[in-house]
């Protein structure tokens, strides 16, 4: 029978399972891609400070449903990338990794909340060109300073009878986010089309009106290759870690507390 404390833990953190030191060693000894001498991948976590975990978000279905999340989850240009809704997100920077966990805990016990991410063999990774993926959409930055301002401009073109954004309330976020479902993405794309059509019909002025439809707009501003994102295997990932990066994978992996290695 499963230990009661482990059952409670897995209920609070679905997809993350505590493992023993012996189990961790067995997993580690069977890995072919990973070596302890490799450049480190790190994440700060707010768990219960167990030294070792296994992470598998394959069955996870809940995530905060922002507009950018919908695009990266469902647009065809991102189809080969790991699904962020089912991914663990981490970095190659110790300093940046600390921001993933509670600041007070990190200041009190910096090593107890900092974990090394150890991927299983044959994993694939999404690599952002900087430490915060939201700041990496260069064409948005050139035209709008930030991707959110692009969507604010779309809202300014809207017919007020419909809502362009499909974002959760703060209460929803605290309760675990909302399901990202394809119908939300379809609604988003349809509403972008409506915004462009409505703006043209009212002779509004906007650089967005040069696009014929939502797909063309998304492809121009959010194509991963054009914005410096990469999809890599583990060996190529390690060789591409030149600065601070945000990284994600939907493949299973191990977490080992930094002071245990």
For every predicted segment, state its role.
Residues 13-17, 21, 46, 118-261:
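Active-site and NAD+-binding cores of ADP-ribose-processing enzymes
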Residues 52-55, 99-102, 127-129:
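A short acidic (Asp/Glu
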Residues 1-3, 110:
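Extracellular interaction modules
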Residues 79-101:
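Extended catalytic/binding region for NAD+/ADP-ribose chemistry, centered on the ART fold
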Residues 41-43, 89-91, 116:
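A structural signal for short, well-ordered beta-strand segments and their strand-loop junctions
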Residues 48-50, 96-97, 124:
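Short acidic, S/G/P-rich loop/turn micro-motifs used as interaction or catalytic elements
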Residues 3-84, 243, 256-261:
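ADP-ribose/NAD+-binding catalytic cleft of ART/PARP-like enzymes
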Residues 104-117:
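Cytochrome P450 catalytic domain signature, combining two hallmark sequence patches
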């Amino acid at each position: 029978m499963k230990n009661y404390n482990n059952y409670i833990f897995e209920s609070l953190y679905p997809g993350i399972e505590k493992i023993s030191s012996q189990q961790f060693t067995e997993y580690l000894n069977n890995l072919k891609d990973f070596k302890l001498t490799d450049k480190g991948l790190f994440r700060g976590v707010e768990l219960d400070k167990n030294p070792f975990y296994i992470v598998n978000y394959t069955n996870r279905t809940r995530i905060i449903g922002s507009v950018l999340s919908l695009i990266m989850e469902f647009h065809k240009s991102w189809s080969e990338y790991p699904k962020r809704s089912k991914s663990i997100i981490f970095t190659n920077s110790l300093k940046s990794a600390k921001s993933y966990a509670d600041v007070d805990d990190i200041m009190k016990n910096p090593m107890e909340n900092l974990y090394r991410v150890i991927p299983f063999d044959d994993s694939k990774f999404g690599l952002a060109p900087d430490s915060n993926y939201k700041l990496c959409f260069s064409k948005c930055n050139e035209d709008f300073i930030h991707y959110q301002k692009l969507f604010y401009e779309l809202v300014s073109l809207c017919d007020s009878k419909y809502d362009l954004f499909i974002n959760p309330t703060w209460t929803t976020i605290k309760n675990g986010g909302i399901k990202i479902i394809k119908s939300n993405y379809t609604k988003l794309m349809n509403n972008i089309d409506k915004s462009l059509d409505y703006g043209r019909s009212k002779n509004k002025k906007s650089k967005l009106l040069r696009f014929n439809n939502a797909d063309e707009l998304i492809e121009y501003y959010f194509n991963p290759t054009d914005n410096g994102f990469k999809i890599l295997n583990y060996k190529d990932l390690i060789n591409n870690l030149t600065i601070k990066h945000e990284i994600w994978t939907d493949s299973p992996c191990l977490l080992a507390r930094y002071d245990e290695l």
